[in-house]
Amino acid sequence: MSRAVFLDRDGVINQRPPEGEYITRWEDFHILPGVAAGIALLNHAGFSVIVVTNQRCVAKGLMTEADLQKMHERMTDVLARAGAKIDATFYCPHEIEPHCDCRKPAPGMLLSAARLRGIDLRTSWMIGDSDNDVEAGVNAGCKTARVIATDATSSERARISEATIIAGIDA
């Protein structure tokens, strides 16, 4: 069995959109500084790198699944040209209600990836920028790390208990 690092997309790989907004065009998709180098380090350390992302913009009709897949293909291509390999991307296109098994904090995307790609979740990591990301990792049996913006307040940092904190990300 292999090990993986599961990465959330918005706020970890690319700049997070303002609250209540969605990235539906490539022109609005901005990869964060240092992401390609970080993914390349994970690749060299022997981890599969898998993106797991909630994308309810599809359920809201703001973007088709085909367009979302094209955006993810482009993200993968841009990162690959910078020496960073994304092995797979899983997304949840559903609305928050009714509940599904793939929308984080549910572990469905991680469990599916593990089953399809032979991943040992106990030796894998979930890295995200939200409580839902960390919960998904915990629910799947992964180790977890939480990325926080450089401008996070001390109270925001204090309430993060389940994950290792990775500070210094300008998201």
Which positions does each model-derived feature cover?
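Active-site neighborhood of HAD-like aspartate-dependent phosphohydrolases
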Residues: 1-48
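Asp-based, Mg2+/Mn2+-dependent phosphohydrolase catalytic module
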Residues: 3, 66, 70-87, 95-126, ...
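Active-site flanking residues adjacent to catalytic metal/cofactor-binding acidic residues
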Residues: 7-9, 53, 128-129
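Conserved protein kinase catalytic core
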Residues: 14-16, 60, 135, 155
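Pocket-edge positions in alpha/beta enzyme catalytic cores
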Residues: 23, 27, 60-63, 97-102
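Short Lys/Arg-rich amphipathic alpha-helical segments
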Residues: 36, 42, 47-52, 68-82, ...
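Short linear capping/connector segments at secondary-structure termini
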Residues: 53-58, 91-96
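A short secondary-structure junction motif
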Residues: 55-68
